[in-house]
């Protein structure tokens, strides 16, 4: 196994610089993009900044954050910028740059071409999945995974241990780096890391668990347990994660949804096996991806877009290796001959992708939820509680106590969800208001029973198409 060790930090290549410029411009244009789940992080941070504690609802110590590292990194920028939404967006954007650059340096370990090593960055900068996940921890997670691969192949075990610990704090699934790398070490020509290399990652993860227990009175975040419970109940159906993965990949490099582009990229990715120097990387990354995907698929976890970010990042690295392998074997060696092709690709992507990307993502994702949240803030008492299924946008704009029907930020609800019981939460946490979809979603089935018992009164002044608002058990109607 040989690596290219002549990596020039001063000359990263025009493709990488161009990709970073595209990412910077797009992120600036899409800065107002608000992902519903990102606003959950933002509300935790805003409450912390306002002195209400690191909580979703003031006075309720429930841990609904599955990425503690992302939350911690967002605190200072949120405080400086004065708005938690800007804090999470800034960290997410900076991590997107870090992810692109990290994968560039990973590929430079195996190939000599600056331009081809930067191809994953260009694909990332032109793909909608990068911007759909802005405000979430996805880019931080992919950056730490890439950095872990880099440190592994550079045999920097001590730094690798720290990086894996941080990856686990970015998303718990980072733990799958451990068995993947252990198998590579066991069956490959590598020495095991010294004991000291395990100390800091153990301390990092252990400290977070201790904090969870002392602050929230629970070792694990309620949001993670809630999603496990949703999977156990069969809420999302069988094979939902895998089917959604296949559906998402049809987008390939554009937002047009072209299957032909996807299959072309897939063939290029398969050709990555031509690059002998990268085969250990292919085995390691694919092993990690197999563990990661199996976890979500076997537990029937919800198919959230940010869960697939690592699939795209690794896929793009395989595509770049495939292009390099084909050029080395059949065409030419070096950067100069591919520059014209990459320029055409970049310009084509900008003209085809950018207008559609900006038109579809250039505004808040859930404008209806935003308007509902504002209405609740103006037409309900400040101490009122509202039960809803999707809590992020409505919770942020309503500034009301939120009861989460699916249990992400409301304690003890997830155990009912695991049993397929979407009604008992109502007895445990009776709200002042319940907002539901019209027609009802399955998760809102409790409304039917309570309505028959005469415990609900519809709020006539709430006139949002596709939604209804009820007062519960004689609570004061909306003003």
Language-model features, listed with the residues they occupy:
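Transmembrane-helix signature of polytopic, membrane-embedded enzymes
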Residues: 11-17, 86-87, 98-127, 142-143, ...
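Aromatic- and kink-enriched transmembrane "portal" helix at the membrane-lumen/periplasm boundary
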Residues: 64, 68-71, 85-102, 118-144, ...
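Membrane-embedded, lumen/periplasm-facing catalytic core of multi-pass transferases
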Residues: 345-395, 401-439, 455-479
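Membrane-lumen/periplasm interface segments of multi-pass, membrane-embedded glycan/lipid transferases
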Residues: 43-44, 50-66, 213-272, 297-298, ...
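Hydrophobic, aromatic-rich transmembrane alpha-helices
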Residues: 100-104, 182-186, 250-293, 319-325
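Specific aromatic-rich, kink-prone transmembrane helix
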Residues: 102-105, 122-123, 140-160, 182, ...
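Transmembrane alpha-helix segments characteristic
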Residues: 17-22, 164, 198-208, 276-298, ...
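Hydrophobic/aromatic-rich transmembrane helices and adjacent perimembrane loops
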Residues: 167-170, 176, 258-261, 284, ...
């Amino acid at each position: 196994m040989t690596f290219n060790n002549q990596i020039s930090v001063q000359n990263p290549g025009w493709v990488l610089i161009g990709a970073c410029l595209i990412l910077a411009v797009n992120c600036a244009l899409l800065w107002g993009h608000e992902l519903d789940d990102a606003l959950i992080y933002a509300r935790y941070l805003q409450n912390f900044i306002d002195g209400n504690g690191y909580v979703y609802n003031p006075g309720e110590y429930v841990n609904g954050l599955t990425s503690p590292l992302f939350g911690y990194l967002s605190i200072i920028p949120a405080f400086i910028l004065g708005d938690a939404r800007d804090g999470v967006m800034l960290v997410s954007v900076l991590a997107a740059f870090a992810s692109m650059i990290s994968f560039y340096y990973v590929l430079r370990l195996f190939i000599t071409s600056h331009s081809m090593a930067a191809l994953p960055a260009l694909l990332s900068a032109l793909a909608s999945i990068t911007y759909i996940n802005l405000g979430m921890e996805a880019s931080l997670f992919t950056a730490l995974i890439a950095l872990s691969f880099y440190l592994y192949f550079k045999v920097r075990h001590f730094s690798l241990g720290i990086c894996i610990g941080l990856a686990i704090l970015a998303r718990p699934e980072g733990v799958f780096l451990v068995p993947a790398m252990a198998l590579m070490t066991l069956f490959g020509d590598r020495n095991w890391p010294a004991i000291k290399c395990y100390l800091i990652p153990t301390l990092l993860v252990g400290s977070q668990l201790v904090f969870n227990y002392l602050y929230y009175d629970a070792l694990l975040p309620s949001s993670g347990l809630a999603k496990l419970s949703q999977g156990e109940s069969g809420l999302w159906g069988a094979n939902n994660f895998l089917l959604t993965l296949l559906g998402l990949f049809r987008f390939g490099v554009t937002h047009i949804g072209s299957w032909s582009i996807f299959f072309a990229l897939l063939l290029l990715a398969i050709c990555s096996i031509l690059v002998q120097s990268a085969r250990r990387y292919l085995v390691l990354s694919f092993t990690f991806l197999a563990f990661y995907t199996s976890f979500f698929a076997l537990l029937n976890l919800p198919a959230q877009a940010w869960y697939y970010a690592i699939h795209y990042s690794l896929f793009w690295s395989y595509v770049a290796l495939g292009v390099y392998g084909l050029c080395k074997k059949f065409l030419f060696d070096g950067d100069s001959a591919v520059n014209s092709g990459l320029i055409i690709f970049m310009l084509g992507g900008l003209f085809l992708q950018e207008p559609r990307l900006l038109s579809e993502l250039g505004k808040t994702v859930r404008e209806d939820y935003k308007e509902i949240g504002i209405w609740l803030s103006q037409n309900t008492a400040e101490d009122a509680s509202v039960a809803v299924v999707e809590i992020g946008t409505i919770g942020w704009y309503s500034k009301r106590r939120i009861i989460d029907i699916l249990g992400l930020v409301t304690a003890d609800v997830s155990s009912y969800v695991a049993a397929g019981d979407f009604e008992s939460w109502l007895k445990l946490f009776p709200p002042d208001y319940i907002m539901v979809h019209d027609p009802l979603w399955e998760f809102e089935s409790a409304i039917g029973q309570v309505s028959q018992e005469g415990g609900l009164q519809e709020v006539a002044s709430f006139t949002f198409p596709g939604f209804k608002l009820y007062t519960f058990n004689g609570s004061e109607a909306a003003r």
